[in-house]
Amino acid sequence: MVMAKVDPNEGLQEKLVQVNRVAKVVKGGRIFGFTALTVVGDGKGKVGFGRGKAREVPAAIQKALEAARRNMIQVELNGTTIQHPMKARHGASKVYMQPADEGTGVIAGGAMRAVLEVAGVQNVLAKCYGSTNPVNVVRATFNGLKSMASPESVAAKRGKSVDEILN
């Protein structure tokens, strides 16, 4: 259940990944509420995710979008794909992502696809193992994207040239 929208003010793409109805049981019955999980990105490497909780769906989505805008990270992309193959995890969710050639497209499951698309990744092969809980898959994908490093940054950290790193 991924819904997409482009925010005209900031040029951010917004995607709703999940809305979940939750219930609090009280003496008089149940009180229902909603949680929402959203991802936002500028399509150029900036991406964030957020969760919101409220009694009504629109309020939960709005809170989630605000949280996502506050929780953005910058990802160094290699053109339209990721820098290198990577594995990441969060809880029991494990994700594997690898760069793909031009024209491949985003081959990834629901929650991962939403994150990668708003980040601006257009060609990637990705797989989710273990738990497919959307919240944990999004967090695992973020962990992977955060850990990704360009050859230039690795070379600078090691004090070597880019050619030495790549060969």
UniProtKB/Swiss-Prot annotation:
It comes from the Bacteria. InterPro entries: Ribosomal_Su5_D2-typ_SF, Ribosomal_uS5, Ribosomal_uS5_bac-type, Ribosomal_uS5_C, Ribosomal_uS5_N, Ribosomal_uS5_N_CS, Ribsml_uS5_D2-typ_fold_subgr. Residues 12-75 form the S5 DRBM domain. Keywords: Ribonucleoprotein, Ribosomal protein, RNA-binding, rRNA-binding. One of its GO terms (molecular function) is rRNA binding. One of its GO terms (biological process) is translation. Belongs to the universal ribosomal protein uS5 family. The N-terminal domain interacts with the head of the 30S subunit; the C-terminal domain interacts with the body and contacts protein S4. The interaction surface between S4 and S5 is involved in control of translational fidelity. This is Small ribosomal subunit protein uS5. It comes from Alcanivorax borkumensis (strain ATCC 700651 / DSM 11573 / NCIMB 13689 / SK2). The lineage of its organism: Bacteria, Pseudomonadati, Pseudomonadota, Gammaproteobacteria, Oceanospirillales.
